[in-house]
Amino acid sequence: MSDETPNEGMDTPLADSFSEIRLEDLSPDLRTACERAGWPSLVPVQAKAIPYLLSDRDVMIQSRTGSGKTGAYLLPIMQKIDLQKNVVQALVLVPTRELALQVSQEALMLTAGTQLRT
């Protein structure tokens, strides 16, 4: 383990090189998906994490349950999928069956009405 690895629970803010993103900054399909999910705007964890993920940066998010973490990584995944490629382009791994079901339900809700498959 490197000395540069943050300790668990350490409050390490994201660098200021990326500005927060707003719902209006997303593609029309993603805005529609958010509306379908009942999200009138992005929550703070999404607004801060999505620009990093869209820039192919690795992000580790620690936030309370129900804070929007799942949407924070599903929305950039959906944005980056190339519909012209008929291959698996993303894989989400989670530690429990219960969490897998929750993530699957959210992915199904967000991809409903799109050409994306889960």
Language model features with spans:
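Hydrophobic alpha-helical transmembrane segments of integral membrane proteins
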Residues: A47, A72-Y73, L91
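N-terminal intrinsically disordered, low-complexity tails of helicases
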Residues: M1-R57, P95
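Walker A/P-loop
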Residues: R57-I77
